[in-house]
Design a protein with these regions (language model features):
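Extracellular/luminal low-complexity segments enriched in Ser/Thr/Pro
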Residues: 77-89
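Solvent-exposed, low-complexity, repeat-rich "mucin-like" stalks and linkers
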Residues: 29-59
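Short strand-coil-strand connectors
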Residues: 53, 66, 97-101, 123-125
Length: 296
């Protein structure tokens, strides 16, 4: 009987020793703990670490996002963006939970507007304008060339030729045509669009100079407006000039306004003729020029 009691006591002591030696989860952390991302960029890969080393093997990890409509996370911890653009930055908190421990990664998700500076032309023209053309990495680059209503660039920056996306027969009936009179259909960041008819008329009014007799003060006032808009020479492509742009002394960008016969209004500034600004109402469908976005 005493042997039985001894053996039972020994077994209990051994079991207690095993339980005492079983490792416990001490710390849990997510890498990176914070990150910033623009909506067309790749989200970071998350790495979950814990102490003691190896403690997570075989354990259940529960992943959650507090804004899954913006950034979702899978059961195995892979992030995915659910939006293509945002008007305002959003903070998304990703949480990993294991037993009684949690770890978080705070993501700041920014829209495409984060790549631009905003020039306030309200006092002069009645609206704000971005500091560069769509697709330009800096304010001194030309950016992308677009046919009106075609959201795929047909050339970029200093390209000498158009690419395979160019369509000499492009029109409103073409597959993929987007009505750029609606801001949400344009290549602009969310909340921005192409200049409307009223905005184009404001540009025309504030930058008009007579061919003869303009005063020094009038010339200086127009130059100040154009300088503030930070315009860069662009040139253009069309079906007659798909290999080699028209002169780079011209600054061109599209408006939201449709003209006659499938044409569209465009801004044009010729640096070679003393700084004359033109609102051209005959931008043809085969024409490819940059996009500059505005907002009231």
């Amino acid at each position: 009987m005493r042997h039985s009691i001894f053996y039972a006591s020994a077994a209990l002591l051994a079991l207690a020793a095993c339980k005492k030696d079983e490792p416990k989860l001490e710390t849990l952390a997510l890498e990176p703990a914070t990150a910033e991302v623009i909506t067309d960029e790749v989200l970071p890969e998350l790495k979950l670490t814990a102490t003691p080393e190896g403690i997570l093997e075989g354990k259940t990890i529960t992943w959650t996002s507090d804004k899954p409509e913006i950034v979702a996370i899978s059961e195995d911890g892979a992030l995915s963006l659910k939006v293509t653009d945002l008007e305002e930055p959003q903070t998304v908190v990703i949480t990993a939970a294991v037993e009684d421990k949690t770890a978080t990664c705070t993501l700041t998700v920014k829209g495409l507007i984060a790549r631009y500076e905003i020039i306030d032309m309200t006092s002069a023209l009645g609206f704000k304008i971005l500091d560069r053309n769509v697709g330009a990495k800096t304010a001194d680059e030309v950016g992308n060339f677009y046919q009106w209503g075609k959201n795929t660039p047909v050339a970029a920056n200093n390209d000498a030729d158009v690419n395979s996306n160019y369509d000499a027969e492009w029109s409103a009936s073409s597959t993929g045509f987007a009505d750029w009179s609606k801001p949400e259909n344009t290549p602009c960041p969310k909340g921005w669009g192409l200049p409307t008819e009223d905005q184009m008329k404001a540009i025309d009014d504030k930058t008009y100079l007579p061919y003869w007799g303009a005063t020094d003060e009038e010339i200086a006032a127009v130059k100040a407006i154009l300088d503030k808009m930070h315009l860069v020479n662009t040139g253009s492509f069309d079906k007659r000039n798909t290999t080699g742009k028209t002169p780079d002394t011209y600054v061109n960008f599209w408006s939201a306004v449709s003209g006659d016969n499938g044409n569209h209004w465009m801004f044009q500034y010729n640096n070679s003729d003393g700084g004359m600004v033109y609102i051209v109402k005959t931008g043809t469908p085969d024409l490819a020029i940059p996009v500059r976005c505005v907002k009231e």
